[in-house]
Amino acid sequence: MRNQRRTVVAAQPVEYVEPRRRYIPYPAAPIVGAVAGVSGVLVIISTFFSWISGSGVTGWSMMSKGGFGTSQNFLFSTGGSRIVFSGFWSLLFGVLIVAGAVTLITGWGGANGLVLTAGILGLIISVLSIVMIYTLKLQSLTPGAGLWMFAVFSLIAAVAGGVGQSQMEYMAEG
């Protein structure tokens, strides 16, 4: 047998490192994030509900098959100097609202501006579509539940983003 040499290294003292706590931009950020997240999910779900009652048209069918009028694409339908936006916009703004909400809940940073902007743009597009449907003056065609959901939950997301932005500015001052 051969002699084996063993080298023994003295243990170095271990320095305790406190775990990094996640950054919460303001105390109500998880609540604002949760409200915005639920609103964003409901904006996405609104795509699959009826957008024009009496016709069976959903936001998804407007995007995938075309809506009504003389000109249709996956973004909007036009006809008679009126425009109705498709479900693409509710999907886009819903995803942006949810992304902003996730950053607020997880503490990665304050995405209040993203939630606020997506909520406002979603509200503008949904209200514009609602107004355009009402101007058709056809008793059988009215805005459906999906379009109303898109408007209401975009408004809620915009308010949540606005409250969050206000809280961020308040925390920065004090």
Tell what function each PLM region has.
Residues 2-174:
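Compact integral membrane and secretory-pathway proteins
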